[in-house]
């Protein structure tokens, strides 16, 4: 049996933009993606701490060092610049494969700069 577990998360990132006319996704600073071990086009869940909205989309890479956290397409209706969000990536494995699994947590400041990776 496969179990679904948290692989990684970017904790309390600040939304920097919302682009309704873009085709979809969440644009994330390439440094954040790398630190969280999230691949471009990987499915992610986004939780908005300001309004409680939860959504599923996919990550796309924004310019490294830009601090970008931009909700695109329909997701742009669920967040506004300045909102705080948690970006979560999940994976599956057997009980044996996951025995020693620990999720990667990337903590950021209000400018979306990495302050700690646990």
UniProtKB/Swiss-Prot annotation:
GO terms for biological process: alanine biosynthetic process; pantothenate biosynthetic process. Pathway: Cofactor biosynthesis; (R)-pantothenate biosynthesis; beta-alanine from L-aspartate: step 1/1. GO terms for molecular function: aspartate 1-decarboxylase activity. It catalyses: L-aspartate + H(+) = beta-alanine + CO2. It is found in: Cytoplasm. The active site is at residues 25, 58. Is synthesized initially as an inactive proenzyme, which is activated by self-cleavage at a specific serine bond to produce a beta-subunit with a hydroxyl group at its C-terminus and an alpha-subunit with a pyruvoyl group at its N-terminus. Its main location: cytoplasm. Binds 1 pyruvoyl group covalently per subunit. The modification Pyruvic acid (Ser) is found at residue 25. GO terms for cellular component: cytosol. Gene3D superfamilies: 2.40.40.20. Its EC number is 4.1.1.11. Substrate binds at residues 57, 73-75. Keywords: Autocatalytic cleavage, Cytoplasm, Decarboxylase, Lyase, Pantothenate biosynthesis, Pyruvate, Schiff base, Zymogen. It comes from the Bacteria. Its cofactor is pyruvate. Catalyzes the pyruvoyl-dependent decarboxylation of aspartate to produce beta-alanine. Heterooctamer of four alpha and four beta subunits. Belongs to the PanD family. This is Aspartate 1-decarboxylase 1. It comes from Gloeobacter violaceus (strain ATCC 29082 / PCC 7421). The lineage of its organism: Bacteria, Bacillati, Cyanobacteriota, Cyanophyceae, Gloeobacterales.
């Amino acid at each position: 049996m496969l179990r679904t577990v948290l692989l990684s998360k970017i904790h309390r990132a600040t939304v920097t933009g919302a682009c309704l006319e873009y085709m979809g996704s969440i644009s994330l600073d390439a440094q954040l993606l790398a630190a969280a071990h999230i691949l471009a086009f990987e499915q992610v869940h986004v939780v908005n701490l300001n309004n409680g909205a939860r959504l599923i989309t996919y990550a796309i890479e924004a310019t490294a060092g830009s601090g970008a956290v931009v909700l695109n397409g329909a997701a742009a209706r669920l967040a506004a610049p300045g909102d705080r969000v948690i970006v979560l990536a999940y994976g599956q494995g057997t009980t044996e494969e996951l025995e020693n699994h620990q999720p990667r947590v990337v903590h950021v400041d209000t400018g979306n700069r990495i302050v700690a990776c646990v």
